[in-house]
Amino acid sequence: MKQSLAVKTFEDLFAELGERARTRPAGSATVAALDGGVHGLGKKILEEAGEVWLAAEHESDDALAGEISQLLYWTQVLMIARGLSLDDVYRKL
């Protein structure tokens, strides 16, 4: 029997990142990124977007999914840095 993997939803990730921003655990990469500010986060998002594009062109679906997950992570960190909620974004979909 194949063991199922726990799946983290977009909402779960946002809640987890928000908790890290509030509690500021030592050694957290999320906290360090938030402390680096919006400019650094924007640069990271551009980097990840490029990696998504390259993965779409040249890599497997699994590799592409991994790159997309990183883009979503950094986008959510930027949202938290700017004080946006998921609902702020959902209203624009």
From Swiss-Prot:
Gene3D superfamilies: MazG-like. GO terms for cellular component: cytoplasm. Keywords: Amino-acid biosynthesis, ATP-binding, Cytoplasm, Histidine biosynthesis, Hydrolase, Nucleotide-binding. This is Phosphoribosyl-ATP pyrophosphatase. Its EC number is 3.6.1.31. HAMAP family: HisE. One of its GO terms (molecular function) is ATP binding. It is an enzyme of class 3 (hydrolase). It is found in: Cytoplasm. GO terms for biological process: L-histidine biosynthetic process. It comes from Mycobacterium avium (strain 104). Belongs to the PRA-PH family. InterPro entries: HisE, PRib-ATP_PPHydrolase-like. Its main location: cytoplasm. Pathway: Amino-acid biosynthesis; L-histidine biosynthesis; L-histidine from 5-phospho-alpha-D-ribose 1-diphosphate: step 2/9. Pfam families: PRA-PH (PF01503). It catalyses: 1-(5-phospho-beta-D-ribosyl)-ATP + H2O = 1-(5-phospho-beta-D-ribosyl)-5'-AMP + diphosphate + H(+). It comes from the Bacteria.
